[in-house]
Structures are given as C-alpha cells and as structure tokens.
C-alpha cells in the first residue's frame, strides 16, 4: 500500500479495521428501522445464532435492507474495504494463487450474508468471538446510554460498554486504537473488519440502551457471481405457472420437486 513517496507498506498479515461515518439521512433511516424491528411483536430473533449474553437481538430481512437503502450502502462500503485489503502488500496476488475464484484483477463482487440489530442493556455483554461463513464483518453504532454508572476503579474509564478488538495484541496505545468507546462520539460510525478478527463488547451499569447493527458479507469473484446468476436463471425457467381453482388464481410451483427440499 503506497503511503507516500518511497514508503510502501507490505503487511498481508495485518487485520485492517476501517471506520467510516454513515451519511446523516441514512443513519436516521437506520435508527427508525431498528425502532420498528424492536417494537414488532413478530420480530425474528437472532439470539440462538449469536454469542451475546443479550436478550434482544433481531435479524433484519433482506427486503428491509433494500427498501431502506442499507443494502446498497453496505455493498458499496464492503467493496471499498475489500479493495483496501487487496492493495495491502501482495494480498491481491496471494488470493489469486490460493483460491480458484480469487480477485483476478480486482474483478470481484460482494454479497451481504446476514444483518441483525443488537439492543444491549445493563449487565448484558458480548463475549470474545469471531464470525463464521463470511469474509468481512461490520458494526454500526446507533445509540449509547446517555449516562452509565462509573466503574468501581474510577481511573479505569472508557471500557464499560466498549467494543474491544482483541486480535491486535497489546500494542502501544499511541499506534493503535483497539477500543471503540461507549460514548456519543462513536454514534453513527460504521466499522468494517475481517470476520476472523476476535472482538467483544463489555457490559455496563446504568439505565439506557446500547444499540448497534451488524452485518456479515462475503466476497466472490465476478465469475462466481455470473455462475450464480445463470443458475438462478435456469431455476426460474423450470418454474411453471399453473392455473388452479376458480377465479383464475395463479400458483407458482417448481417443476423440480427436489427444490422444495432445499434448506433456507
């Protein structure tokens, strides 16, 4: 990665965390969307699939991501993040050698695998963990408690309710910032990182809600994407429109019965 004249960083092993401020209007839309999800009695709980010792964690449906404009934004930011990773040292060439469907000249595509919202309250926490079945993860901070109780040892401030990246090691605090503090300065920021980077969220004491939105993304080659699109096209051609019953009601059924046995 060119950092200046005669200064190039070659660190393909580095776990890059990239932070970007979410556009104000999109942030407002996201806050409203997560409000509605939290209040919906039919919300889809994500708790069974997540590591958090947290009661309120809910999936965000793909159509909601698309309608809100989040899908387009997440794909744009993830693609930009992956481009940054590839320019770091020889990652581009290394991926091309190792994987059959590598970047191949930056010819790749991004897809959002899943997204969920986390509503964390007093004494709840997220233990150290990483994310599987994806390559890139991200978290957007939406809300922090207005005031949390001070720690028992008051000189150790800034950790309660904080997002901690553990994979960076105990580096000099002047060189790295592995702690995303639980305060208003971090609201509205999106942080992207490798899915393998271990992280946790500390508990806090006091009233109020700590809210975030997370998503997992995968990176595939354009060749893979074209293959998926072609496969979906072929599946669509197998679908028959069958006129059943009175009143001309139309039901769509798959010609291949095995499609009905597929996992969701």
Q: Which role fits each region the language model picked out?
A:
Residues 1-105, 123-126, 242:
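Non-heme Fe(II)/2-oxoglutarate
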Residues 12-16, 111, 134-136, 209-211:
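Residues at beta-strand starts and edge strands
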Residues 23, 120, 141-143, 216-220:
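Solvent-exposed residues in well-ordered beta-strands and their adjoining turns
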Residues 67, 71, 131, 184, ...:
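Aromatic-acidic/polar surface patches that form glycan- and anion
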Residues 85-92, 145, 220, 224:
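Solvent-exposed amphipathic alpha-helical surface segments
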Residues 105-109, 205-207:
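A short beta-turn/loop motif at secondary-structure boundaries
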Residues 109-192:
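Catalytic core of non-heme Fe(II) oxygenases with the double-stranded beta-helix
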Residues 171-264:
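Catalytic core of Fe(II)/2-oxoglutarate
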């Amino acid at each position: 990665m060119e950092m200046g004249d005669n200064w190039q960083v070659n660190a393909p092993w580095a776990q890059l965390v990239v932070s970007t401020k979410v556009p104000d209007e999109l942030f407002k839309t996201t806050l409203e969307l997560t409000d509605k999800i939290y209040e919906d009695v039919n919300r889809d709980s994500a708790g069974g699939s997540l590591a958090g010792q947290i009661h309120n964690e809910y999936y965000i449906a793909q159509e909601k991501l698309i309608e809100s404009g989040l899908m387009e934004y997440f794909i744009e930011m993830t693609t930009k993040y992956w481009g940054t990773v590839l320019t770091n040292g020889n990652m581009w060439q290394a991926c091309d050698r190792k994987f059959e469907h590598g970047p191949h000249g930056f010819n790749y595509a991004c897809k959002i695998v899943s997204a969920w919202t986390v509503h964390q309250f007093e004494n709840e926490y997220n233990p150290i963990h990483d994310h599987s079945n994806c390559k890139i993860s991200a978290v957007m901070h939406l809300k922090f408690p207005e005031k949390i109780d001070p720690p028992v040892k008051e000189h150790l401030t800034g950790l309660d309710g904080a997002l901690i990246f553990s994979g960076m090691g105990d580096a000099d605090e002047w060189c790295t910032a592995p702690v995303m503090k639980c305060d208003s300065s971090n609201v509205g920021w999106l942080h992207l990182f490798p899915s393998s980077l271990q992280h946790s969220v500390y508990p806090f004491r006091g009233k109020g809600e700590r809210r975030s939105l997370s998503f997992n993304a995968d990176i595939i080659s354009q060749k893979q994407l074209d293959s998926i699109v072609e496969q979906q096209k072929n599946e669509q051609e197998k679908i028959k429109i069958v006129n059943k019953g009175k009143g001309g009601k139309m039901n769509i059924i798959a010609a291949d019965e095995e499609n009905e046995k597929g996992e969701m």
